[in-house]
Amino acid sequence: MKLPKEGDFITIQSYKHDGSLHRTWRDTMVLKTTENAIIGVNDHTLVTESDGRRWVTREPAIVYFHKKYWFNIIAMIRDNGTSYYCNMASPYYLDEEALKYIDYDLDVKIFTDGEKRLLDVEEYERHKRKMNYSDDLDYILKEHVKILVDWINNGRGPFSEAYVNIWYKRYVELKNR
């Protein structure tokens, strides 16, 4: 699969461990691709839930996906600052149809004031039993929660204000071309 280029639009598909489609984002603009990572932006992007419900994202959000980390990061740019939503998820896979990953329920939310919250622990435990997550998978996900928290605490990558500013500025330049 040829990597998308800056300014291209891609679809993102989130699946569950059992292979069922969870959520789809249409028309995410690609800002940068490397061998292992894709940075994009959603801004008033159409989202379709597995039950057919549809909604549109409200504010610009820089999205970060990596082939070696078991999480993806959404930096939501709001008037009162940047908040983050981080999905514990498989590394992404890219094919002609979409960027795809498996969502593993656990999420970390960082509010504009810096407060961090681990979300959906009960859902993770329920799906772990129902979908038979292996002990190895459970270990990998919990280790990557630690890696993610380290990134957050140290302002690494998407958690750096400069990172968000650079990629938002690039998005505005591309949008206005």
Swiss-Prot record:
It catalyses: a ribonucleoside 5'-triphosphate + H2O = a ribonucleoside 5'-diphosphate + phosphate + H(+); a ribonucleoside 5'-diphosphate + H2O = a ribonucleoside 5'-phosphate + phosphate + H(+). Mg(2+) 2 binds at D105, D107, D120, E123. InterPro entries: DUF402, FomD-like_sf, Ntdp-like, SA1684. Keywords: Hydrolase, Magnesium, Metal-binding. The active site is at R23 (proton donor). Its EC number is 3.6.1.15, 3.6.1.6. Coiled coil: none annotated. Pfam families: DUF402. It is an enzyme of class 3 (hydrolase). Its cofactor is Mg(2+). Mg(2+) 1 binds at N87, D103, D107. GO terms for molecular function: magnesium ion binding; nucleoside diphosphate phosphatase activity; ribonucleoside triphosphate phosphatase activity. Has nucleoside phosphatase activity towards nucleoside triphosphates and nucleoside diphosphates. Belongs to the Ntdp family. This is Nucleoside triphosphate/diphosphate phosphatase. It comes from Streptococcus pneumoniae serotype 2 (strain D39 / NCTC 7466).
